[in-house]
Curated annotation (Swiss-Prot):
Involved in chemotaxis. Part of a chemotaxis signal transduction system that modulates chemotaxis in response to various stimuli. Catalyzes the demethylation of specific methylglutamate residues introduced into the chemoreceptors (methyl-accepting chemotaxis proteins or MCP) by CheR. Also mediates the irreversible deamidation of specific glutamine residues to glutamic acid. Residues 22-140 form the Response regulatory domain. The active site is at S241, H269, D365. This is Protein-glutamate methylesterase/protein-glutamine glutaminase. The keyword Phosphoprotein applies. GO terms for molecular function: phosphorelay response regulator activity; protein-glutamate methylesterase activity; protein-glutamine glutaminase activity. Belongs to the CheB family. Keywords: Chemotaxis, Cytoplasm, Hydrolase, Phosphoprotein.
Length: 425
């Protein structure tokens, strides 16, 4: 009932070379387990640390296998993924866990709970073994998530030092600390309820990466910032990807006065079903109506609109109103929904009154649309590197020189409240 392969021993490379990323694959399907393992072994910078059938196997082997990343199935015999997750995090400091699940509502809800308990990310898994074998997008996305989430962990072999200075990605610690605000209670190893507060092991996970992030941030040149628009903002646009659900929950919880003044439109890279659940979580966090955008519905202040999975969401002018326009066209920036279509469309509706926030995420989605918003007289705020899970999207905006502010996640909401009140310029 255990492993399909032996646990691989840690490798020692010549000093100065990077160790391969050690990935543990945990799935009760031998076919899927073998397929993902072959994909990992085909990557020059990765290796399979262990290939296991159940969550119980993973918990018992995690210290010996010493993985950097665990790809963890949700539905397994003996001990499922959500039950194994806190035990894995308690046993292995700095462990990155990517939850893998099929696109069912139940699994989407479990994935969100896993994020609140310390999982780094999730990935939707194709429904059948045949679909997995043919799923180039699934393979690409999984390898990218493993690589980008683990980037800050990589270091020269045999050197017990912080991540190298050339690591451009943000600390996963924000994922853990944002869980404190999620109001989802955790349980200890004995199953007893405890306060919603980070496990001591998770606090330790927070401390070291934060210091490395702070050192890198201090050594980096300060970004070139633009002045905020002289226009009073009339709409808030938000784009996010990896790490976005937790960041969005934190952000919307603090911008009630903004939502009351204007519409809030969000694109989060996420598949169908998951966006439905995310909208429900956002409504609870904000205490305001939030739902997936519906084609041709009128956009109103006091509401949060989320791009539905598998559709681009744009806005358009229709008489005196702004309306949602859903687009089933090709992926943009390899994503659907993508941030750029939303940002670009906002110019025709709000011109210089559009204010956009680019949160944590891989890639550069939002940068082109943000550039057009700035050219039209609007403003961009980017999440800073230290508080981002992955500083791809916000980093691209910063490097493009289009941002009026680059802020830690916890400082973005207060800044937005001041800006929309007219006193934050």
């Amino acid at each position: 009932m255990g492993m399909s392969t032996a646990v691989a021993s840690p490798v020692a490379l010549d000093s100065g070379k990077l160790e391969p990323l050690r990935v543990m694959v945990v799935d009760d399907s031998v076919v899927i387990r073998g397929l993902i393992s072959r994909w990992i072994e085909a990557e020059p910078d990765m290796m399979v640390a262990a290939s296991l059938r159940t969550g119980r196997d993973a918990v018992s082997q995690v210290e010996r296998a010493d993985p950097d990343v665990v790809v963890l199935d949700i539905e397994m015999p003996e001990l499922d993924g959500i039950s194994a997750l806190p035990q894995l995090l308690a046993k292995k400091r700095n462990l990155i866990v990517i939850m893998a699940s099929t696109l069912t509502r139940r699994n989407a809800e479990i994935s969100f709970k896993a994020l609140s308990l310390g999982a780094s990310d999730y990935i939707p898994k194709p429904e059948s073994t045949r679909e997995v074998a043919a799923a180039d997008i699934f393979r690409h996305d999984l390898m990218q998530k493993i690589r980008h989430l683990a980037a800050k962990r990589r270091r020269p072999a045999t050197v017990a030092s912080p991540p190298p200075d050339h690591d451009d990605y943000g600390s996963n610690a924000s994922t853990i600390m944002n869980a404190v605000d999620s109001n989802i209670s955790e349980r200890d190893a004995g199953g007893k309820p405890r306060r919603t507060f980070p496990h001591p092991a998770l606090v330790q996970r927070e401390q070291q990466p934060r210091s490395a992030q702070a050192a890198r941030a201090m050594s980096r040149p300060q970004p070139t910032l633009r002045s905020f628009s002289a226009h009073l903002p009339r709409a808030l646009l938000i784009g996010s990807s990896t790490g976005g659900p937790q960041a969005l929950m934190t952000l919307v919880a603090g911008i009630g006065p903004v939502i009351d003044r204007c519409p809030v439109l969000i694109t989060q890279h996420m598949p169908p079903t998951f966006t439905t659940i995310l909208a429900e979580h956002l409504a609870r966090a904000a205490g305001r109506p939030a739902h997936e955008g519906v084609d041709q519905e009128i956009v109103k202040q006091g509401h949060i609109y989320l791009a539905p999975g598998g559709r681009h969401m744009r806005v358009a002018r229709k008489g005196a109103d702004a309306v949602i326009v859903l687009d089933n066209g090709p992926a943009v920036n390899f994503c659907k929904p993508a941030v750029d279509p939303l940002f670009m469309s906002a110019i025709d509706v709000w011109q210089g009154g559009a204010l956009a926030v680019i949160l944590t995420g891989m890639g550069s989605d939002g940068m082109r649309g943000g550039t057009q918003i700035v050219a039209a007289g609007g403003s961009i705020i980017a999440q800073d590197e230290a508080s981002s899970v992955v500083w791809g999207m916000p980093g691209a905006a910063v490097q493009a020189g289009i941002c009026a502010a680059v802020l830690p996640l916890q400082q973005i909401a207060p800044k937005l409240v001041r800006l929309f009140a007219g006193d934050g310029l």
